[in-house]
Regions:
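Glycine-rich, anion-gripping cofactor-binding loops and their flanking helix/strand elements
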Residues: 1-62, 167-175
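Short, well-ordered beta-to-alpha junction loops that form the rim of enzyme active sites
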Residues: 8, 156-160
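Glycine-centered flexibility motif
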Residues: 13, 51, 83, 157-158
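A sequence-level detector of short, solvent-exposed, charge-rich linear segments
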Residues: 16, 24, 53-57, 80, ...
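Generic recognition of flexible, low-complexity loop/linker segments
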Residues: 26-27, 49-51, 140-143, 150, ...
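Thiamine diphosphate
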Residues: 28-34, 72-74, 80-92, 162-175
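Phosphate/pyrophosphate-binding active-site segments
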Residues: 58-157
């Protein structure tokens, strides 16, 4: 599927960060610009700003879940589909495959994601800033040298989460 994907705490790891559709570094931009959001088996909670139009300015929501409770909390979807998410997304994919739609925004958001990662990784991390404080990227750069490949990454606390999403390359990650 060529559909941009954002994960949350509940779904982290379902689609690897290396997948070209995972646009974790473009989270804010994607949420504010999306015209369609498909929620698969999850509630609209604080991680998604409860679906607030202040964040999701133009978005329509399709909500798919095996649980009726997940379909009706907060902002309602149109449609709301009570189904196994895997089955529903496969049917949607089959229908979209027959469509000819403009993928300009999809390509733009993926490029934005890659550029943002590059910008963060290209910053000189071994120096302190003008305020003599450490660059948060240095933390993750140093961690790469001491952790195993299959470590479980956990990040908590405000701004550090933005840096962790880009710098903490963990197969298993929780924030």
């Amino acid at each position: 599927y060529n559909i941009p994907y954002l994960d949350t705490q509940d779904s982290r790891g379902l689609i690897p960060q290396s997948n070209s559709n995972n646009i974790f570094a473009a989270r804010s931009k994607a949420m504010s610009e999306a015209d369609l959001v498909i929620l698969l088996g999850r509630k609209l909670d604080y991680q998604l700003a409860f679906g607030s139009p202040a964040v999701f300015k133009e978005a329509k929501f399709i909500r798919i879940s095996e649980s009726a409770l997940e379909l009706t909390d907060n902002r309602r979807g149109f449609p709301e589909i009570l189904s196994d998410p895997g089955v529903a997304i496969e049917l949607i994919h089959n229908k979209l495959n027959k469509s000819n739609f403009d993928e300009t925004w999809i390509n733009d958001i993926k490029n934005f994601h890659l550029e943002k990662i590059k910008k963060v990784l290209d910053k000189e991390v071994n120096k302190t800033g003008d305020d003599n404080k450490i660059n948060p990227n240095l933390i993750f750069e140093k961690l790469k040298n001491i952790i195993d490949e299959d470590f479980i990454g956990i990040a908590d606390g405000g701004d550090i989460l933005s840096f962790a999403r880009v710098g903490l390359h963990s197969k298993y990650y929780i924030d």
